Amino acid sequence: MERRNFAALCAAVLCFWLFALAFGTAQGMGLHLVARREAETASAQAVWVEPALPAAAAPALSLICRAALLIEQDSGRVLYEKNAEEKMPIASITKVMTLLLTFEAIHDGRLTLDTLVPVSEHAYHMGGSQIWLEPGEQFTLDEMLRAICVSSANDAAVAVAELVGGSEPAFVEQMNARAAQLGMEQTTFRNACGLDTEGHLSTARDVAIMSREILTHCPEVLRYSGIWTDSLRNGQTQLVNTNKLLKRYSGITGLKTGTTSGAGVCISASATRDGLKLIAVILGAPSSADRFNAATTLLDYGFGAYEAAPLPALPSQPLQLAVKGSAEGSVPLDYSALPETILLEKGAGGTLRGELTLPETLEAPVERGQAVGKVSVYQGENLLSEYEVRAAVDAAKLTLPDALHLLWESLTGVS
């Protein structure tokens, strides 16, 4: 009798396990949802792209420079381009990558703004724009970032590169590795500050990709690049921003200028108006006036032709989705990929609607960050953009020990 009872219990456990694998656990059949909401607004073709930046039709603009590119920051859509794939020196715009790696080191906990940055003989000997660092001097990382962003100091950039990478050559390797990760296929860095060096080349498109990355993931850079004047050494060293658009253009937020004999006069400028964020890249202008005039022309075109419209709200936005074959039963959903606004062409008219698509259930295993659904934005029947809905946590596949534990809980009430 006891043997038959034990066999029955084993059979029950096996059946419970198989049932759980086949049909899931707490959440049952899950859901299928397509949610829509319509709103009358302007519309235009807009495609979410990362990291490639596709070009839109645009009128010819009078720009005195070798290369130019205008993108909308949130979507990455190219609004205007001129010789955007031509490789050329980019001068101190190089420092955008130096700043990106530095802010990422801060985010990772390897550095703080109070970290002291020593000055080496190598950093001391940098030419070009500088704050005249002396070997053995120390400044906080916050002070060095101000020197880099406001005065474009080459000596400060190299000192920070040595702190982050151990040496400037090692840091340059990190710069090139990060560029490759971002899809900057035409870029090769040879130094951390942008001084003319053979083979130190990039393109307007790659500069836009790099600029978009730092503005999106390290927006604190604007607290530095938006400073007009500052000082170091208890007021003895004055810093004045090289980006004159800060005083001349409404909505300018900052970023980086650059000038060398090989690169000409350059800028990657960021600006925001009414929620629309633009990045204008100008390379190889013959003069500072031409650089700022070209950037102004690009930004004027962008703000005049486009707008940022609110993403259409969805009447229902489920917080979780059922999972079959997992002890978790369901996973919470992550909607963080959805932007607050969508790029639209001014005056185009039309109906903007959003559509959320999710499966009935998910099959275990599910990994955190896995795409499990999408939000599509349409103008009429024309698809404008798609954004991923992701799983917010892992959901491991149910194992026999998991099934035994769940059965024990159900029989005894003891977890």
Annotate each predicted stretch with a short phrase.
Residues 4-27:
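Sec-dependent N-terminal signal peptides of Gram-positive bacterial secreted proteins and lipoproteins
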